[in-house]
Amino acid sequence: MCGIIGYSGPKQPLPILLGGLSRLEYRGYDSAGIAISDGENIIIEKKEGKLQVLKDHLLDSKIKGNIGIGHTRWATHGVPSDENAHPHYDNNQDFAIIHNGIIENYAEIKEELQKEDYQFESETDTEVVAVKLSRQWTGNLLETVCKVAKELDGTYALVVTTTKQSNTIVAGRMMSPLVLGVGDGEVFLASDSAAILEHTNKMIFLENGDFVEIKNGNYQLFDINMNKVTRDIQEIDWEVSEAEKSGHDHYMYKEILEQSEVIERTIAGRLEVGSEEIPIDLKKAKQFEKIWIVACGTAYHAGLFGKDLFEKVLGVPVSVELASEFRYREPIVGENDLGIVISQSGETMDTIAATELLKENNSHVLALVNVVGSSLARMADSVLYLHVGPEIGVASTKAYLGMLVGQLLLAKHWDESNKLETTFNEIKQLPSLIKETLKCEAQIKEISKSINEKKDIYFIGRGLDYALAAEGALKLKEISYLHAEALAAGELKHGTLALIQDGTPVIVTASQHHLLDKTTSNVQEVKARGAYVIAIGDNSSKKLQDISDDYVTLPEASEMLSTIVSIIPLQFIAYHVANLNGESIDQPRNLAKSVTVE
């Protein structure tokens, strides 16, 4: 959620910090700040609001130094304000700290420090740590940070520098992501590799409990007891251009348009029987007695799609679980179960906690993630990477499509009897099918003009189409701020039909041929109440086309692939409705790209 950037090396830190913070804007934030040290003094500049406010403030700045740290804050303790923005000083301005996550026992620590007459300028838990570092200074920054960290409860990542030990940065990870970028005589820190990718593709993903001491462009890793540890350097194969808009107005729009290209990477090398790119083969898959799919938000909706596929090909029960609820209801998980955890970032805190529960019960854990080296990738027994490149827009598009395709690939490799009724050769044509489906944009743009001022919009579908409807509704509400609700079409008569009135938009996904008659009957029900119906399907149902106000025709394909590409019109609807209403598409209010707190 919050963003961290740090630098040590021969260059001036300010432009590197501001550039890194720019690449972290997509994570969501309400204020931003930087701290730069020349070895004798630490200068902090921070502002509430967008990063541009800070940039304008620093326009004529002549701040110079040897090291620097920067932060974008997402308010948890204290309102958004200049005072609560990071970095924070201690009382003597000897220490500067930035921090992601939550210090759960900060109030008790603060109370103890106040009894000793320490003062606080902000409402944050972060400043409490800065003051405690000053209070417990041992003469060595690494030692002091490790000592204080042992007294902190919570999940967090922190980065500290001090005038008491010049040219030194110490950072630590406690369940909140932190990555070290290794350059030529320079070292970078970030909460997300995308922030430093323009400087280096050599990354070290810190493990929980890792601390790093950075001096003069060099680094050394330690555990919390100051024992040296080593971690492998991983080379990230993302291109810097993939994290840029490439001339488009919004990242989300660019990411919708590039789905044909990125899905080609998702399927590459995975279409041959026995491919080593598939982490669990059929023999092993047949040994599982139950499958748990655990995820949040968009990834959860992708899991709804996977449930039907895996039950069909393996004949075992599949349960799709919200990660935020999973570990609190004492699920009956066994050692012969497979846990499939899905997350674009691989850092979703609730999903990480759910993964720990699965592993405690000796289940085999398979992670579907996009970010190489992420926490879930390292925790899992097996990994299937999505390979869709960096996704910057908060509203997931290409990563969601990658999740659908990733699960389809797994299911097809486990499909002994072709129960999915699709072939590897057909899946190979998916990038071309996506490209053809993208041509619906002009029609969607016109349709969007009919619904962008509506207050309530409903999405319906049956079977796999319901899974797509759920994601379509989420996309619309998270970037347009319109109320959108998805439901299985057969549930309309159990309550929601009471809300349908003249002009109410109802968006129908209808790719499941065996359910077309039932879906069409549900559409007739809402039409009878005056609904404005937008249907998405192929040429299989003239009746549905005839009763719909607008019908988006999908390219000819197998039923399974038609279902997958149905999401593209829904993505376009969300984008163009939000754009017509002038909303902040890439950074919707109150939302963050990667939810790294519980």
Regions from the language model: what does each represent?
Residues N66, G70-E83, G269-K283, K307-I342, ...:
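Glycine-rich oxoanion-binding loops at beta->alpha junctions
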Residues K283-Q429, R462, T509-P555, I573, ...:
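Glycine-rich phosphate-binding loops that contact phosphosugars or nucleotide phosphates
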